Amino acid sequence: MLIRTSAEIYLEEADEFLNKGGLVDVCEKYYKAAREAIILLAYKYNIHGDNIEDIVTKLAEILGDNVISYWAGASLLYTARKELDAELIKMYRQDVVELVNLANEKFNS
């Protein structure tokens, strides 16, 4: 049995907001989904750090540099949330989806 993660739930909520047009809320939800995915991966691999960027770097040593790229996209969604249009959000959404999928794959295996 697969367990739905908080990352998946945030991702679904963000997709719902995107359909309704609440772009700032969308960016925040996508960021939360990515953050939860990082937390799940850190738990899975027993990784600790002073901040989430340290954890992402340590995860990249295990899982590959894509983790850094995915996290960068998610971080951009959050830091530039008031400036992004729907098309850019959809583009960076893919980084979040990849990160959530990676976390689910590793956590549920």
Locations of regions flagged by a protein language model:
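A short, ordered amphipathic alpha-helix with a cationic face
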Residues: 1-3, 28, 45-46
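Charged alpha-helical initiation segments
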Residues: 1-23
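Alpha-helical initiation/capping and key positions within long helical/coiled-coil segments
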Residues: 6, 25, 88-91
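TPR repeat positional signature
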Residues: 10, 29-30
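Alpha-helical solenoid scaffolds that mediate protein-protein interactions
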Residues: 14, 33, 40-41
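Solenoid-repeat scaffolds in large eukaryotic assemblies
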Residues: 26-27, 33
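Short amphipathic alpha-helical surface patches that mediate protein-protein
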Residues: 31-32, 57
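Long, charged low-complexity segments
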Residues: 38, 42-109
